[in-house]
Amino acid sequence: MDTIHYMLDNAGYLASLTFQHLWLVALAVGLAIIIGVPLGVLIVRHKWLATPVLGAATLLLTIPSIALFGLMIPLFSLIGHGIGVLPAVTAVFLYSLLPIVRNTHTALDSLPPGLREAGRGIGMTFWQRLRWVEIPMALPVIFGGIRTAVVMNIGVMAIAAVIGAGGLGLLLLNGISGSDIRMLIAGALMICLLAIVLDWLLHRLQVVLTPKGIR
């Protein structure tokens, strides 16, 4: 009951931290989509790149999150931004790359060869085939990678509070430092709820964007 009262009494503060958390995750995953999807296309077209690119992305994901955030501090201190949003978003961006690149590569590489041959047969260029045939067919799997990145990094971004990025992780950090169990439970509940809601919303968006013929 104490936790519920705390959450009701601090609803405005919790909402502010939630939107801040959402913005940080959206920025990191958005950058990963911009970089990761074209990178996935590239390693499908140039297959010799697949092993080193996917290997590097996998290696990044094996680094403990607190260690990766710690590594960002001296790197970004060189440009005067050792703590705050920039190193946090960069770390989460790196974590987001693997599921997006891997799913893009898997989705495009597993398409039936006949689709590409049919596109070539009617005179489509590579980019036309990619835009009108391959990406629409691969979209459900690509979106699966985006969903994985978002849900995974809702939790990872909470740790970014230790380097001054803000977000819902502040509740956990302040709860630990102040031995306030209400803040700890409230922070954990908000992070879990946010991950569940975003996963559901992205699933609905995936259904809407998937061509009717392959739903």
From Swiss-Prot:
<keyword id="KW-1003">Cell membrane</keyword>
<keyword id="KW-0813">Transport</keyword>
<dbReference type="GO" id="GO:0031460">
    <property type="term" value="P:glycine betaine transport"/>
</dbReference>
<protein>
    <recommendedName>
        <fullName>Osmoprotectant import permease protein OsmW</fullName>
    </recommendedName>
</protein>
<keyword id="KW-1133">Transmembrane helix</keyword>
<dbReference type="InterPro" id="IPR035906">
    <property type="entry name" value="MetI-like_sf"/>
</dbReference>
<feature type="transmembrane region" description="Helical">
    <location>
        <begin position="24"/>
        <end position="44"/>
    </location>
</feature>
<dbReference type="GO" id="GO:0055085">
    <property type="term" value="P:transmembrane transport"/>
</dbReference>
<keyword id="KW-0812">Transmembrane</keyword>
<feature type="transmembrane region" description="Helical">
    <location>
        <begin position="153"/>
        <end position="173"/>
    </location>
</feature>
<feature type="transmembrane region" description="Helical">
    <location>
        <begin position="78"/>
        <end position="100"/>
    </location>
</feature>
<feature type="transmembrane region" description="Helical">
    <location>
        <begin position="183"/>
        <end position="203"/>
    </location>
</feature>
<dbReference type="GO" id="GO:0005886">
    <property type="term" value="C:plasma membrane"/>
</dbReference>
<keyword id="KW-0472">Membrane</keyword>
<dbReference type="InterPro" id="IPR000515">
    <property type="entry name" value="MetI-like"/>
</dbReference>
<dbReference type="InterPro" id="IPR051204">
    <property type="entry name" value="ABC_transp_perm/SBD"/>
</dbReference>
<comment type="subunit">
    <text>The complex is composed of two ATP-binding proteins (OsmV), two transmembrane proteins (OsmW and OsmY) and a solute-binding protein (OsmX).</text>
</comment>
<comment type="function">
    <text>Part of the OsmU ABC transporter complex, which is involved in the uptake of osmoprotectants such as choline-O-sulfate and glycine betaine. Probably responsible for the translocation of the substrate across the membrane.</text>
</comment>
<feature type="transmembrane region" description="Helical">
    <location>
        <begin position="132"/>
        <end position="152"/>
    </location>
</feature>
<keyword id="KW-0997">Cell inner membrane</keyword>
<feature type="transmembrane region" description="Helical">
    <location>
        <begin position="51"/>
        <end position="73"/>
    </location>
</feature>
<comment type="similarity">
    <text>Belongs to the binding-protein-dependent transport system permease family.</text>
</comment>
<dbReference type="Pfam" id="PF00528">
    <property type="entry name" value="BPD_transp_1"/>
</dbReference>
<feature type="domain" description="ABC transmembrane type-1">
    <location>
        <begin position="18"/>
        <end position="202"/>
    </location>
</feature>
